[in-house]
Amino acid sequence: MTPESVMALGYEAMKVALALAAPPLMAALLSGLLISLLQAATQINEMTLSFIPKILTVFFTLVIAGPWMLNLMLDYMRTLFGQLPNIIG
C-alpha cells in the first residue's frame, strides 16, 4: 500500500464524514441563529429556550436527509470493502 493510496483513503473518509455531519450541523446553526435573533429582538434572555427548537430541527433534518446520508455511507463502505484486497496485499 503506497502513501498516495493511504492519503486518498483518508481524504475520501474525511470528505464523507464532512458530508454526513454538515446537514444536522447547519440546521442546528441556522435554528440557533434564528432563535438568538428572536431572543435579542424580544429581550428574552432564557438560555434553555433554544434547546428544544435545535433538537427538533436536527431531528427533522435527520429524518429528511437520513436516506441520502445512509446511501452515501453505504456507497463509501462498499468502495472501501471492494478495495480491501488492494489495501491488504
From Swiss-Prot:
Tagged with keyword Transmembrane helix: yes
Membrane spanning residue stretches: 16-38, 55-74
Keywords: Bacterial flagellum, Cell membrane, Membrane, Transmembrane, Transmembrane helix
Localisation: Cell membrane; Bacterial flagellum basal body
Membrane topology classification: Multi-pass membrane protein
Keyword Transferase: no
GO BP term (any one): protein secretion
GO cellular component, one term: bacterial-type flagellum basal body
Recorded family membership: Belongs to the FliQ/MopD/SpaQ family.
PANTHER family from the UniProt entry: FLAGELLAR BIOSYNTHETIC PROTEIN FLIQ
Role according to the record: Role in flagellar biosynthesis.
Name of the protein in its database record: Flagellar biosynthetic protein FliQ
Gene transcribed to yield this protein: fliQ
